[in-house]
Amino acid sequence: MIQGEILGDKVLINDVEKAKEIYKLGYYGKPLDITKPKSPEDIKKPLILSLIEALYLSKKKIIEVIRDGKVIDDALLYKIGMENIPRFELLYTVYEDLREKKFVVRSGMKYGADFAIYTVAPGLEHAPYLVIAIDEEQEISPNEILGFGRVSHSTRKNLILSIVNQRNRSIRYIMFKWLKL
């Protein structure tokens, strides 16, 4: 099994060959040497995974996460995520669902969203969708929706609100698409 070492709120895959394997599986993580590799062979340095990616890959038995020289279980990794990342439970729920639907899911932070999702791959296409995760119990105003929409419109991406019922982990997706009339 591939090992990654937890460093704060990230997990480092030090072995470059293993980093290439993980990246090849679904464009997980960010290599230290290049922003958007076109292929796993472009990776020449270690790979950094977010805690969300690491938990997903750990649950899939693809990686094991090491802390202080010992393998940690998924429950502890989840707890570390909850302690270090605001809205971790909500974000992980959406991330896992999108990955299970076979999307390539990357951080959407630079776009003001939670995730950017690709149908092909980063580096080979621009992300067609931005995703914002919202708890079903959370109230949002029309102005907030307009704000979300402005971000997606200015970057020419479709906006998807993922509305999560935390009790049963169900998710409803609503897509906003700008039209020129």
Swiss-Prot record:
This is tRNA-splicing endonuclease. The keyword tRNA processing applies. GO terms for biological process: tRNA splicing, via endonucleolytic cleavage and ligation. It holds the Pfam family tRNA_int_endo_N. It is an enzyme of class 4 (lyase). GO terms for cellular component: cytoplasm. Signal peptide: none annotated. The keyword tRNA processing applies. PANTHER family: TRNA-SPLICING ENDONUCLEASE SUBUNIT SEN2. Keywords: Lyase, tRNA processing. The gene is endA. HAMAP family: EndA_short. Endonuclease that removes tRNA introns. Cleaves pre-tRNA at the 5'- and 3'-splice sites to release the intron. The products are an intron and two tRNA half-molecules bearing 2',3' cyclic phosphate and 5'-OH termini. Recognizes a pseudosymmetric substrate in which 2 bulged loops of 3 bases are separated by a stem of 4 bp. NCBIfam families: endA (TIGR00324). One of its GO terms (molecular function) is lyase activity.
